Amino acid sequence: FQFGKQTGIDLPGELGGILPSREWKKINKDEPWYRGETLITGIGQGFMTASPLQLALATAAIANKGQLLTPQVMMHSQSKNGDLFEELSPKSDQIPIKDISNWELIIEAMKQTVYGKFGTAKRLNNKLQYSLAGKTGTAQVFGLDPEEEYIAENIEEKLRDHALFTGFAPIEDPQVAIAIIVENAGSGSSKAAPLARELLDEYFIKNPVAL
């Protein structure tokens, strides 16, 4: 999914984030790598960092069953009098995977997040007029000791968890991938997911965009 690397978007100042590894930790922390770090990195914890754009691109890659797109803002260039100089075609790569049926498993799991009885974003399925698959999340700002309990009210606001939601729609013919992060807001299901629903409603229903 290209985590830890720049996406290649045609905007300045992009950072690649961190996808930690044994080599990265030795170089940057001068510390050994532990087995548990492999596990927590797989769910985005530890030293791993990613931008909302990277999360949206990873979500789009899942929706497209492995096609990883390079994001771009400029679609074409033209002169002052309107003459077209260059039409810019989207670039993409295919993510290698041993069993391509795993894409369907992931998509179904994300679908159940919205439509399943125990889905963490099942409230989004209230009068939903398009199919939506997603994933809620909570990004920790700092780590707790094993014996400590996270109680938001007892923690300074700037240190509280970030709320996260990422998803795509429609499921059958994906057009939009979205990633929402609400800083220090807590629950992704109650804070970030409703914002995603508002934006997607605007895109598909209130002001539909012709593709």
Each predicted region: which residue ranges?
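Beta-lactam-recognizing serine transpeptidase/beta-lactamase-like catalytic domain environment
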Residues: F1-A177
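Short amphipathic alpha-helical face segments that pack within enzyme cores
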Residues: S51-L57, K191-E198
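Short, gly/Ser/Thr-rich active-site loops of penicillin-recognizing serine hydrolases
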Residues: D83-S92, L195-L211
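Short beta-strands and strand-coil junctions in structured, solvent-facing domains, enriched
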Residues: G186-S187
